[in-house]
Amino acid sequence: MRLILLGAPGAGKGTQANFIKEKFGIPQISTGDMLRAAVKAGTPLGLEAKRYMDAGELVTDELIINLVKERLQDSDCANGYLFDGFPRTIPQAEAMKQAGVAIDYVLEIDVPFDEIITRMSGRRMHPASGRTYHVKFNPPKVEGVDDVTGEPLIQRDDDKEETVKKRLDVYVSQTKPLIDYYNNWAQKGDPSTSLAAPQYRRISGLGSVDEIRARVFDALK
């Protein structure tokens, strides 16, 4: 099972990724984790990545792809892998294809943006304990204060509506085009590569966690 999980920020990808990993016994591959591990291990690719990072520059797509290829040689990838947050752009997807990285499924978790804004902007946190609440789905007993201590709750900057909307704008401009890219490849094929086209699946990310998990597993049969 080799797959890419797509969806907007707040669509619930992280929760469903954990279910997929457990069911199929595959690792979740995050480029951020890969970069940190390679830098820590001092591998040639890690040292190259460190030069970019120390200079405050973005690591090149070519280097990321080489890290991906190196990571896929590890024994835990024998039964497959789950890409999390990669590729983010069409050039990265093209580079993966040219590098011969095989993908069986591209799974999109689709949630309307107004629902995502409600989900994310409604989060509240008690800083000292890390306890989390939601003004709509899991409200505190008394509005704005922690159930245990009575101390005030905060809204993280990342959860403010303005920030959420900016993240969704970036998703629309950079990552959403990947959906069309993979859908077209799945439907029409691509004579420029010997790789089999992945199957593209879209599921609704609305409903309970268990309902969405059932849809995910149905889509991957």
Curated annotation (Swiss-Prot):
Q: State where it is primarily located.
A: cytoplasm
Q: Where is this region: LID?
A: 122-159
Q: Where in the cell is it found?
A: Cytoplasm
Q: Where is this region: NMP?
A: 30-59
Annotated EC: 2.7.4.3
Please tell me where ATP binds in this chain. G10, A11, G12, K13, G14, T15, R123, T132, Y133, G207
Q: Which Pfam families match?
A: ADK (PF00406), ADK_lid (PF05191)
The Swiss-Prot or TrEMBL record describes its family as follows: Belongs to the adenylate kinase family.
Description of how the protein assembles with itself and partners: Monomer.
Q: In its UniProt entry, what is this protein called?
A: Adenylate kinase
User: Which organism's genome codes for this protein?
Assistant: Paraburkholderia phymatum (strain DSM 17167 / CIP 108236 / LMG 21445 / STM815) (Burkholderia phymatum)
